[in-house]
Amino acid sequence: RADAETVADLRRFGKAISGVRRSNYRGERAEVVKQRLDRDRLKLLEHGDPALWVNEPAVLGGFGLHSDRVFFNEDTLRFFRVACLLNDAALLCDFRVRTPRATLWEIGGGWGGFAHYFKTLFPDATYLITAPPALLLLSATYLMTLFPDAQFRFFQPADPAAFMHDWDTIDFAFA
């Protein structure tokens, strides 16, 4: 687990992963970005399910725009769009039913933003991230800080069978 300042520093690396930069929300660019993102947000909410909206977590160095009592950035809009597309494709049904516990597998989990988004919507799901070790370290640090009471599991090559042991109790798994 990390403190808010450390996670904010780690989020700076997120711009290389997702292209979203804190600097776009300050200074000269801020108004242009705000207009574009507000327009995009309203369009997405018009066509998507508002129940799938999750605010950007401000507590850990989150950044973005405040509008209509929501806090968001480009990643938030992307995550909302993906959640709506999954919903439209009827792929979220399994996550709404609590038994058996469903697993979502994200390949190349980035900095953990979508994992946070998804687990906020579906806390009883198991979220598996497979990625290179550097990304696993980044996403695990972020998620362990946001979800301090969650159960985490890391793949151990010396004991691969242990990874699946008591799978129904795991919130986040990394391999």
Per-region residue spans from a language model:
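Conserved Class I S-adenosyl-L-methionine-dependent methyltransferase catalytic core
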Residues: 1-98
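P-loop NTPase catalytic core of nucleic-acid-dependent motor ATPases
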Residues: 82, 101, 118
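Conserved class I S-adenosyl-L-methionine
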Residues: 99-110
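Residues at the starts of beta-strands that form the adenosine-phosphate
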Residues: 103, 125-126
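Conserved SAM-binding loop of SAM-dependent methyltransferases across substrates and taxa
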Residues: 111-122
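Conserved SAM-binding motif I beta-strand of class I
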Residues: 126-132
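Short alpha-helix immediately C-terminal to the canonical SAM-binding loop
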Residues: 136-137
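S-adenosyl-L-methionine
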Residues: 142-175
